[in-house]
């Protein structure tokens, strides 16, 4: 059984979410089918958790829309994901940022910025 799981996960290809960590602000373009039309829907928010490994890995992204918190659990290997853009690298001291759920307004999205090193 373990060999079967490895075979399926190896066929999934490269992971587009390797650089995404909790605390990062990301913009994800998702393919949405409405009736016979297909369009792209952007979801921009803070990654508050990642879960699982390999083919079953998911991330939870949270944003505030019109004063209401909206969370979306996104499977990393979903074929409906068009692109992933990291807008800001956040510095989180926890693996799960569920404490952001209790915050409102600007404080709900406030995560310190992570310093990135430039290799010369």
Swiss-Prot record:
A single GO molecular function term of this UniProt record: structural constituent of ribosome
PANTHER family assigned: LARGE RIBOSOMAL SUBUNIT PROTEIN BL19M (PTHR15680:SF9), RIBOSOMAL PROTEIN L19 (PTHR15680)
Role according to the record: This protein is located at the 30S-50S ribosomal subunit interface and may play a role in the structure and function of the aminoacyl-tRNA binding site.
Residues passing through the membrane, by range: none
Gene name in the database record: rplS
Protein name (Swiss-Prot/TrEMBL): Large ribosomal subunit protein bL19
One BP annotation, GO: translation
Family matches, as InterPro entries: Ribosomal_bL19, Ribosomal_bL19_CS, Ribosomal_bL19_sf, Translation_prot_SH3-like_sf
Superkingdom to which the source organism belongs: Bacteria
Coiled coil region boundaries: none
One Pfam family per UniProt: Ribosomal_L19
Cytoplasm in keyword set: no
């Amino acid at each position: 059984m373990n060999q079967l799981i490895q075979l399926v996960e190896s066929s999934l290809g490269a992971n587009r979410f390797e650089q995404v960590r909790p605390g990062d602000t990301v913009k994800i373009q998702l393919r949405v089918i409405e009736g016979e039309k297909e369009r792209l829907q952007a979801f921009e928010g803070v990654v508050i958790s990642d879960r699982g490994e390999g083919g079953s890995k998911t991330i939870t992204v949270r944003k505030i829309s019109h004063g209401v918190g909206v969370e979306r659990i996104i499977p990393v290997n979903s074929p409906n994901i068009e692109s992933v853009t990291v807008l800001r690298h956040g510095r989180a001291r926890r693996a799960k940022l569920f404490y952001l759920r209790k915050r409102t307004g600007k404080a709900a999205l406030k995560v310190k910025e992570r310093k990135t090193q430039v290799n010369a």
